[in-house]
Amino acid sequence: MLFAVYMIDKLGMEAVRAQTGKAHAEYMATNEEGIRMGGPLYADDHKTMIGSVVIKDFSNRTDAENFIKNEPFNKAGLFETVMINPFKAFVDN
């Protein structure tokens, strides 16, 4: 089942994002199976990262919660908000 994981950064956490970026990339590479799409969210300036989104196939919501619980950005306290919702792809190129 697809879930969208939508994560918004706390304000003023740019240094944490930069310091944790390598661990985040390694975590995503290790857990890439089932990822349909993912990447950073940007402010309107198209330069400032303000969060992340991942659309991934999980067996259930608990697996999605465990995935984000162990994600390095989340463990470092980067996120102000984390939303996990079932997702249905109407268009899948």
Regions found by a protein language model. Give the residues of each.
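Conserved, structured core segments of small domains
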Residues: 1-93
